[in-house]
Amino acid sequence: MDTVVKLNNIFSGLPKNKKSKVLGRGIGCGKGKTSGRGHKGQKARSGVSINGFEGGQQSIFTRLPKRGFNSLLKHRYSIVNLSTIQRLIDSKKIEDVSAITKEVLYNLGVISSIKEKIKILGNGKLNTAVAIEYDFISKSAESQVTLLSNVSASKE
């Protein structure tokens, strides 16, 4: 006795995905000529939306003052801490400590691009003598690296 109508047993007989109407193919298709956009005007044209336009009201980005600037001399480099390098050595992800290059750091996901410049910072403690390829190094990091081995860090 399944005479009770429930949400899970209603059958409409209609297709699940209704096909969208093809626009602009003559008056016989129901959406021909103006394709449901009305006659003329800005909204009838393609690329209708003007970014930041608020219907004649002055837009938010012209109401607010200009602030700051982007410096052309900004240092753009990846920062690698000595603690990160020591952690990778301890977890045996870096086997060859005699040549830690940009490629090695990139493959391990420490830096996001091989083209980036690298700055080594002395955050953390380094227990292993390593040879690191870098572009910049802090004084504390350089002292830790040179303390462990004679020829260790190399500027690219």
Swiss-Prot record:
Gene3D superfamilies: 3.100.10.10. It comes from Ehrlichia chaffeensis (strain ATCC CRL-10679 / Arkansas). Binds to the 23S rRNA. Residues 34-43 have a biased composition (Basic residues). InterPro entries: Ribosomal_uL15, Ribosomal_uL15/eL18, Ribosomal_uL15/eL18_sf, Ribosomal_uL15_bac-type. Disulfide bonds: none annotated. Keywords: Ribonucleoprotein, Ribosomal protein, RNA-binding, rRNA-binding. GO terms for molecular function: rRNA binding; structural constituent of ribosome. The gene is rplO. Part of the 50S ribosomal subunit. GO terms for cellular component: large ribosomal subunit. Belongs to the universal ribosomal protein uL15 family. This is Large ribosomal subunit protein uL15. It holds the Pfam family Ribosomal_L27A. Residues 29-48 are annotated as: Disordered. GO terms for biological process: translation.
